[in-house]
Design a protein with these regions (language model features):
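C-terminal lobe/lid and adjacent interdomain/linker elements of RecA-like ASCE P-loop ATPase modules
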Residues: 45-63, 70-123
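GG-anchored amphipathic helix commonly corresponding to the ABC/SMC/Rad50 NBD signature/C-loop
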Residues: 5, 13-37, 45-57
């Protein structure tokens, strides 16, 4: 059984490491994979590793559907991106997607965003 997860017990790994062990060791066959916010368990670096796993899965003939708030996972090349607006799914590009734009705004204006968020609204 341990060989199915890379030879290490899932209980001896962090949450993110156990997720990556599942992806890389158990989900190898061609299939349809559906994930709901996999980034919740994955560090930034493991999100990058997840992109590599996605490429390997797609190259093996798999299809992957992901609900995500991660600009890293959203950046998968040639991904078809949908956003829900007023209960309707609409296609969008990476650069136009609010997930990317919001993260970019934070990263490029971190100090201002933090100042505004943590300011005393009673002053």
């Amino acid at each position: 059984m341990l060989n199915s997860y890379g030879g290490v017990s899932l209980h001896e790994q962090s949450h993110g490491e156990s997720f990556m062990a599942l992806f890389t060791n158990r989900l190898k066959n061609k299939g349809l994979y559906i994930f709901d916010e996999p980034e919740a368990a994955l560090s930034y670096m493991n999100q990058l590793r997840f992109l590599v796993w996605m490429k390997e899965a797609v190259n093996a003939g798999s299809q992957i559907i992901i609900s995500t708030h991660s600009p890293v996972i959203l950046a998968y090349p040639d991904a078809e991106i949908f956003v829900a607006e007023d209960g309707i799914l609409k296609t969008t590009s990476y650069d136009d997607c609010y997930i990317y734009r919001d993260m970019l705004a934070f990263v490029t204006n971190k100090d201002l965003v933090i100042k505004e968020l943590l300011s005393d609204p009673t002053r």
